Amino acid sequence: MSTNNSVLVLKVGGALLQCEMGMARLMDTAAAMLANGQKVLMVHGGGCLVDEQLAANGMETVKLEGLRVTPPEQMPIIAGALAGTSNKILQGAATKAGIVSVGMSLADGNTVSAKIKDERLGLVGEVTPKDGTYLKFILEQGWMPICSSIAMMDDGQMLNVNADQAATALAKLVGGKLVLLSDVSGVLDGKGQLIHSLNGKQIADLVKQGVIEKGMKVKVEAALEVAQWMGQAVQVASWRDASQLIALAKGEAVGTQIQP
């Protein structure tokens, strides 16, 4: 991949944080891209760590339509797990791979506007792009921002944002190419086979059939939103698959292409 000005927005799932080899492989891929002049922005969740921390504090995890319900009393624990532990674990892996990274959250640099998404979800945020100055400065230095999905409202209230939706807002902000990486190779059909390409109508049909549901529904709808906004395909792929990462580094299509 030659030097270019486009930004590759990599969203990584929380399950990655529990796989040291997967993290090392992904960061090596990112390091190779950065060395080639490709700007890389990483956005992460940390669901597994959040679940562990909540359980350790005697609290339970409740999800509604694939989104984590966030009561006010859970917010400090969720913020600590995402903006703290998860972010620093990924930064540590980046440092080990020789990457200069900047750990940040959606609350930094006036990057996004945040509001309550749905009262039923508690302190769950919906974010829209606001000011790209801070992010663009970091990217122009050849550094890699590693952004957690904790946002802040104008009154200082912290909000928990779904990481796929956070990556969507940041991809729009920097005009980047979005790749949603999880622990599955892409969107699978009812028989567990990889679907290579999907458009809005096909997605709606698969949601109706119950083939795409919960977290994957949130992921695919976030991907479709960016695909339509940018007028280009968004990839849903796996960090577990070394061959997908190599193809990704070469700028090739991997996983499922969500078409505008």
Swiss-Prot record:
Q: Please state where this protein is localized.
A: Cytoplasm
Q: In which pathway does it act?
A: Amino-acid biosynthesis; L-arginine biosynthesis; N(2)-acetyl-L-ornithine from L-glutamate: step 2/4
Q: Which residues bind substrate?
A: G46, G47, R68, N160
Pfam family of this protein, just one? AA_kinase
GO annotation, biological process: arginine biosynthetic process via ornithine; L-arginine biosynthetic process
Please, which domain of life does this record's source organism belong to?
A: Bacteria
User: Which Cys residues form disulphide pairs?
Assistant: none
SUPFAM superfamilies (alphabetical): Carbamate kinase-like
Entry keyword Metal-binding? no
Which residues are annotated as site, described as Transition state stabilizer?
K11, K219
> Carries keyword Disulfide bond?
no
Keyword line? Amino-acid biosynthesis, Arginine biosynthesis, ATP-binding, Cytoplasm, Kinase, Nucleotide-binding, Transferase
The principal location of this protein is cytoplasm
EC numbers listed for it are 2.7.2.8
| InterPro entries registered for this protein in UniProt | AceGlu_kinase-like_sf, AcgluKinase_fam, ArgB, Asp/Glu/Uridylate_kinase
Query: What molecular function terms (GO) are annotated for this protein?
Result: acetylglutamate kinase activity; ATP binding
Question: Catalyses which reaction?
Answer: N-acetyl-L-glutamate + ATP = N-acetyl-L-glutamyl 5-phosphate + ADP
Q: Gene Ontology cellular component?
A: cytoplasm
In which family does this protein belong, per the annotation?
Belongs to the acetylglutamate kinase family. ArgB subfamily.
Q: What does this protein do?
A: Catalyzes the ATP-dependent phosphorylation of N-acetyl-L-glutamate.
Protein's UniProt name:
Acetylglutamate kinase
**What organism does the record attribute this protein to?**
Shewanella putrefaciens (strain CN-32 / ATCC BAA-453)
Q: What is the lineage of its organism?
A: Bacteria, Pseudomonadati, Pseudomonadota, Gammaproteobacteria, Alteromonadales
